[in-house]
Amino acid sequence: MAKHLFTSESVSEGHPDKIADQISDAVLDAILAQDPKARVACETYVKTGMVLVGGEVTTSAWVDIEELTRKTVREIGYVHSDMGFDADSCAVLNAIGKQSPDINQGVDRADPKEQGAGDQGLMFGYASNETDILMPAPITYAHALVKRQSEVRKDGTLPWLRPDAKSQVTFAYEDNKIVGIDAIVLSTQHSPDIAQADLIEGVMETIIKPVLPAQWLNKDTKYFINPTGRFVIGGPMGDCGLTGRKIIVDTYGGMARHGGGAFSGKDPSKVDRSAAYAARYVAKNIVAAGLADRCEIQVSYAIGVAEPTSISVETFGTGKVSEEVLIKLVRQHFDLRPYGLTEMLNLARPIYQATAAYGHFGRNEFPWEATDKADALRADAGL
């Protein structure tokens, strides 16, 4: 029997990089709500006492960047200088300019269907039947832990919690099947007046046990709860944060490859985002159709060109039909041109701020998680 361990991590909405992602996507959503055809590339930097919002935007919309930023930080929970960051007193600097006309001429077309890709690049999508949401288990449960931390912080169950937190889960596999959880790391920012023993008990009983399936925990499972012993200074005071620095947390926790392009702050004409969503949609439908147990899709683009420069499929030996057949089915059932995938997934609307914490995939409220093509794929594959 082949045994191996696999680890994925996640971070909470109060992590500095995630604050930046959420501000960038809040700006994107506010612009798309007024102007669905806007071109947006919004980057954010956060550090003690300040937020810098920059990037390139071409739009007819007007949004109050400062108020939007403060509202986002407030909703995350940084509302007092004791935390090292305060939504009402931090400085907000706006350095947004216009998109280069050189890019515009390569992307825009008289016929919208021939819209070119906003940049070159390669994107991956992945799905696996090891969970019911067709996502890898390690990242799924890493997200669930920090999501639970946020819930019990906000509802007052554990009032000493603060917004910044990180999780990490190591799963044990035999012959690529989960046999248990080997290790759990959960570090959470907290107020200075909570004793370490009380914190460990609260996290174990209120966050870890309700989230992780008991059948995967055993006497050998290792728990690391705030292993440094103290985590009072966190958020932007502890570390500066930048948009796009949590691309593995945002996707598959390292279980699949990544093309390198971040998502947050980018409108759907940016294939870094829209094609990665479409690739997840394709991979998930292939697995939902029973054509493979695991599936990774790669697509690539040239700037200003509508058709993908390549489409490839990898099923890791789990495919029920050949990968050549799968590629043919992908081309037949999915329009992966920039305009086509925006239309296919209805992406030109304000749905992005919710993606910017706890993962972009495995959450059924998003259109790229639908499995509406599975039956047709299965039928055309002859299964």
Curated annotation (Swiss-Prot):
<feature type="binding site">
    <location>
        <position position="239"/>
    </location>
    <ligand>
        <name>ATP</name>
    </ligand>
</feature>
<feature type="binding site" description="in other chain">
    <location>
        <position position="99"/>
    </location>
    <ligand>
        <name>L-methionine</name>
    </ligand>
</feature>
<keyword id="KW-0547">Nucleotide-binding</keyword>
<dbReference type="InterPro" id="IPR022629">
    <property type="entry name" value="S-AdoMet_synt_central"/>
</dbReference>
<comment type="pathway">
    <text>Amino-acid biosynthesis; S-adenosyl-L-methionine biosynthesis; S-adenosyl-L-methionine from L-methionine: step 1/1.</text>
</comment>
<dbReference type="Pfam" id="PF02772">
    <property type="entry name" value="S-AdoMet_synt_M"/>
</dbReference>
<dbReference type="InterPro" id="IPR002133">
    <property type="entry name" value="S-AdoMet_synthetase"/>
</dbReference>
<feature type="binding site" description="in other chain">
    <location>
        <begin position="230"/>
        <end position="231"/>
    </location>
    <ligand>
        <name>ATP</name>
    </ligand>
</feature>
<dbReference type="GO" id="GO:0005737">
    <property type="term" value="C:cytoplasm"/>
</dbReference>
<keyword id="KW-0963">Cytoplasm</keyword>
<feature type="binding site" description="in other chain">
    <location>
        <position position="270"/>
    </location>
    <ligand>
        <name>L-methionine</name>
    </ligand>
</feature>
<dbReference type="Pfam" id="PF02773">
    <property type="entry name" value="S-AdoMet_synt_C"/>
</dbReference>
<comment type="function">
    <text>Catalyzes the formation of S-adenosylmethionine (AdoMet) from methionine and ATP. The overall synthetic reaction is composed of two sequential steps, AdoMet formation and the subsequent tripolyphosphate hydrolysis which occurs prior to release of AdoMet from the enzyme.</text>
</comment>
<comment type="subunit">
    <text>Homotetramer; dimer of dimers.</text>
</comment>
<dbReference type="GO" id="GO:0000287">
    <property type="term" value="F:magnesium ion binding"/>
</dbReference>
<feature type="binding site" description="in other chain">
    <location>
        <begin position="164"/>
        <end position="166"/>
    </location>
    <ligand>
        <name>ATP</name>
    </ligand>
</feature>
<keyword id="KW-0554">One-carbon metabolism</keyword>
<keyword id="KW-0460">Magnesium</keyword>
<dbReference type="InterPro" id="IPR022636">
    <property type="entry name" value="S-AdoMet_synthetase_sfam"/>
</dbReference>
<dbReference type="InterPro" id="IPR022630">
    <property type="entry name" value="S-AdoMet_synt_C"/>
</dbReference>
<dbReference type="GO" id="GO:0006556">
    <property type="term" value="P:S-adenosylmethionine biosynthetic process"/>
</dbReference>
<keyword id="KW-0479">Metal-binding</keyword>
<dbReference type="GO" id="GO:0004478">
    <property type="term" value="F:methionine adenosyltransferase activity"/>
</dbReference>
<feature type="binding site">
    <location>
        <position position="239"/>
    </location>
    <ligand>
        <name>L-methionine</name>
    </ligand>
</feature>
<keyword id="KW-0630">Potassium</keyword>
<keyword id="KW-0808">Transferase</keyword>
<feature type="region of interest" description="Flexible loop">
    <location>
        <begin position="99"/>
        <end position="109"/>
    </location>
</feature>
<feature type="binding site">
    <location>
        <position position="17"/>
    </location>
    <ligand>
        <name>Mg(2+)</name>
    </ligand>
</feature>
<feature type="binding site">
    <location>
        <position position="266"/>
    </location>
    <ligand>
        <name>ATP</name>
    </ligand>
</feature>
<feature type="binding site" description="in other chain">
    <location>
        <position position="56"/>
    </location>
    <ligand>
        <name>L-methionine</name>
    </ligand>
</feature>
<dbReference type="InterPro" id="IPR022631">
    <property type="entry name" value="ADOMET_SYNTHASE_CS"/>
</dbReference>
<feature type="binding site">
    <location>
        <position position="262"/>
    </location>
    <ligand>
        <name>ATP</name>
    </ligand>
</feature>
<keyword id="KW-0067">ATP-binding</keyword>
<dbReference type="InterPro" id="IPR022628">
    <property type="entry name" value="S-AdoMet_synt_N"/>
</dbReference>
<protein>
    <recommendedName>
        <fullName>S-adenosylmethionine synthase</fullName>
        <ecNumber>2.5.1.6</ecNumber>
    </recommendedName>
</protein>
<feature type="binding site">
    <location>
        <position position="43"/>
    </location>
    <ligand>
        <name>K(+)</name>
    </ligand>
</feature>
<feature type="binding site" description="in other chain">
    <location>
        <begin position="245"/>
        <end position="246"/>
    </location>
    <ligand>
        <name>ATP</name>
    </ligand>
</feature>
<comment type="similarity">
    <text>Belongs to the AdoMet synthase family.</text>
</comment>
<dbReference type="Pfam" id="PF00438">
    <property type="entry name" value="S-AdoMet_synt_N"/>
</dbReference>
<dbReference type="GO" id="GO:0006730">
    <property type="term" value="P:one-carbon metabolic process"/>
</dbReference>
<feature type="binding site" description="in other chain">
    <location>
        <position position="15"/>
    </location>
    <ligand>
        <name>ATP</name>
    </ligand>
</feature>
<dbReference type="GO" id="GO:0005524">
    <property type="term" value="F:ATP binding"/>
</dbReference>
